[in-house]
Amino acid sequence: MIDFNDILICPSCRLSFEKINNSKICNNNACSNFKTPLIKIKDKFVFIDFSNFMISKTNFLEFNSSSNNVRKNLFFSKFIKSIIYGKSFKTQSNIRRLINNNDRNKKILVVGGGTIGAGLSKFYKEFKKQIISFDIYYSENIDFIADAHNMPFKDLSFDFVIIQAVLEHVMYPNKVVSEIYRVLKNDGLIYSETPFMQQVHEGPYDFSRFTESGHRLLFNNFECIKSGFIGGLGTSLLWSIEYFFTGLFRSRKIGKISKLIFFWLRFIDLLIPNKYNIDGGCGFFFSGRKKIKKISDLEVVDFYNGSQTF
């Protein structure tokens, strides 16, 4: 496991910590955290500036005290999804490429790693000693708890960042991407997956959707290595069928059963030309490299590869 203590900073004043008696103390006397030990949830330090956070410290601690049960349910839900949806063909291909191309001496950051993302299990096994992972809730899969809008790392700390199915759940995606840019070394790599044609999931903590062009715009400070859909029109239809029957019968159980009946729809993605899947895909991936110069608005418009022409 990587020793990440040398790259950690206070989330409030952005200065380094001093380690005292197995705790981390901010010694900046102008900081709101001055001489205040970081709180812990079980064995995980919490690097959050609660003066600039979406929920109060009290509510946050209450949420995390009960989050294990919530996350077990989410894990069960993901297990069911793995049966119905299988693994995205594109995700599997992308992860294989990442494994084959990644240097085993580089630092890897996983943003939102409380649950190991689809297709990432093998990646974790291959690069376990290189990965630093955090999320907003307690999980055995993470090294600590932090806010992706305000990452507790020094500039230029990582060689590679993975953020999978997270950006739709943050309040300010552009801010999170700017933080990724900040903590990545020059020419560092990013791999992101975000949904497009998916209904609301995780209730009040679901905020955004991105087209492929919108995803590209979000990462306009990065050179595009590869981009595309991770689930096509068939997968999008499968999502809609679940929510249609859930609403029609006021029953999530019936919605899940409908997915079991129509699981085969996801294989139709393979029969549909890419340009149509881009216009109605379930989600998109972006693999890129950090660059100093932003791409222009015209380049974002020209990036479109869907079926519609003007």
Regions found by a protein language model. Give the residues of each.
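N-terminal juxtadomain amphipathic helix
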Residues: 3-68
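Short, flexible hinge/linker loops that cap or flank conserved catalytic cores
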Residues: 4, 101-102, 125, 278-280
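General small-molecule cofactor/ligand-binding pocket signal
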Residues: 39, 46, 132, 144, ...
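Class I SAM-dependent methyltransferase Rossmann-like catalytic core
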Residues: 58-100
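Aromatic-acidic/polar surface patches that form glycan- and anion
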Residues: 88, 169, 184, 208, ...
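Short gly/ser/thr-rich secondary-structure transition/capping motifs
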Residues: 90, 142-143, 267-270
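Conserved SAM-binding loop
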Residues: 97-202, 211-216, 288
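S-adenosyl-L-methionine-dependent methyltransferase catalytic module, highlighting the catalytic core
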Residues: 174-175, 179, 189-310
